[in-house]
Amino acid sequence: MTDTPLSLIRNFSIIAHIDHGKSTLADRLIQACGALTAREMTNQVLDNMELERERGITIKAQTVRLSYPAKDGKTYVLNLMDTPGHVDFAYEVSRSLAACEGSLLVVDASQGVEAQTLANVYQAIDANHEIVPVLNKVDLPAAEPERVKAQIEEVIGIPADDAVEISAKTGLNIEGVLEALVTRLPPPVGDESKPLQALLVDSWYDPYLGVIILVRIKEGRLRKGSRIRMMSNGAVYHVDQVGVFAPRMVPVDDLGPGEMGYINAAIKTVADCNVGDTITDDRHPAERALAGFKPSIPVVWCGLYPIDADDFEKLRDSLSKLRLNDASFHYEAETSAALGFGFRCGFLGLLHLEIIQERLSREFNLDLIATAPSVVYRLYRTNGGMEELHNPADMPDGSVVEKIEEPWITATIMVPDDYLGAVLTLCSERRGIQKDLTYVGTRAMAVYRLPLNEVVFDFYDRLKSVSRGYASFDYQMDGYEESDLVRISILVNQEPVDALAFIAHRSAAESRGRSICAKLKELIPRQLFKIAIQAAIGSRVIARETIGALSKDVTAKCYGGDISRKRKLLEKQKEGKKRMRQFGKVEIPQSAFLAALKMDH
């Protein structure tokens, strides 16, 4: 089954903006090649996580092997990788692209080129891919194929006159896509007589088989029963099973150069699988490793704590299994006075954070609290030391800090020009600096530099709401710059609550401090004594709210008679409340934490 000559193999990925029809096109290609029977076919076959179907987005890159009898009489093997379109999963995209030689660029014929399309295309061009433009949704009344072709040529700079016009939903001209793949994409190169070199593209955990690894063979042959070695750490395994996805797992005897498939080698420890590693034969190892992927750098950090403290070990196991499946996610243990034991986790963006949280609660049945997301600051001390700050609660006193640098991004925003004004206002409110503004037809492309801290909380939601959902947004990290940043501590009854501390620009500190105090005032239940909720920068209080005391009517039992009796009781109550205020502990309910952290910043 795997003795296909190299000239008849095509490895390709599908890249596009969110909702431009990647996964639907993948369904049609699978159907056209007869890989699944009509009964097994469902919409978005490759989106096999329940979460992916629910949200209608692709999170994990998936792979499938198809055989296609072309018009030239030969039968080709097509290895398809469906990639995510979201900027938060760009790491998944870069891995898929490294395993392929060409890409189908899918563009919605009614919407045109969007910000994510650009980001993913540039990644494909960097990977030296042959790119075949495909216009999807040409059956829609609003479709303008000619305008979009001109836009592809103008914005991306690749010829689009021979773009394939299709409708993935109705199956129109799917044959044209398959023919374009066969005729326009280059075959892989490789030599099966050389020592084995295979790229580890992905890995995940199967409850029955243990760790399963997805590989792309570059040189040599990978056989069932052979001994393999991981080149990064020298770990050696015995291969139990080799196979391909069609899209079900189909075992085969061996995989040759240019092929994509999976191996199962009884790998017990999750840590031994580093995505981007090179796998070679233990007896005849390759001389050098393949160029892997650049490791992903987490951009957003937040604390995850189990609501039930007994779940800590379960959370640790769950995180290590998720890390195997999603190499772009990092975690380390930490403790908090308010929330107990938990983990500080690093993500590529807010959607990534949300998805990991959802997966932990669905796949591992964990109830978690997440602290407010923060970015990584660089802190320079007066004694000359530099450290990275992941947690706002760890920020030292201002007297020992010389300067703080925060990360900036370059954001590309595509928006119809009717909504441009609102988008520019939003960017300048968030301390943005305009770098470029160009028009492509009726759409504007704005390039801004923005502090990541301002984008992390709700920038994406606000952008969608001011542009009625039409704006699309993509960003790249763009270094660190010094800024006037302060740590705001939240104190409840004079006690600092470390989980609610955050870092903000001095200009926004007061308004954010005030809004979080007002929110907590609504959420913390009243006690028998007054509770002060304060936001402070160092020792200076910048906002305060007071929760009034519950009053118990101690004089109810007195009737008429002398005032001194009542006064005595009231004085006694006053003394008691004073003592309570001194020693009373305020329990902040779980719901108050969640609501304060979710707050629209």
UniProtKB/Swiss-Prot annotation:
Source organism phylogeny: Bacteria, Pseudomonadati, Pseudomonadota, Alphaproteobacteria, Acetobacterales
Catalytic activity: GTP + H2O = GDP + phosphate + H(+)
Name of this chain's protein: Elongation factor 4
Listed PANTHER family: TRANSLATION FACTOR GUF1 HOMOLOG, CHLOROPLASTIC, TRANSLATION FACTOR GUF1-RELATED
Organism, scientific name: Gluconacetobacter diazotrophicus (strain ATCC 49037 / DSM 5601 / CCUG 37298 / CIP 103539 / LMG 7603 / PAl5)
A cellular component annotation (GO) from this entry: plasma membrane
EC numbers: 3.6.5.n1
Signal peptide (UniProt feature, chain positions): none
Family, per entry: Belongs to the TRAFAC class translation factor GTPase superfamily. Classic translation factor GTPase family. LepA subfamily.
Membrane topology of this protein: Peripheral membrane protein
Coiled-coil intervals: none
InterPro entries registered for this protein in UniProt: EF-4, EFG_III/V, EFG_V-like, EFTu-like_2, G_TR_CS, LepA_C_sf, LepA_CTD, LepA_IV
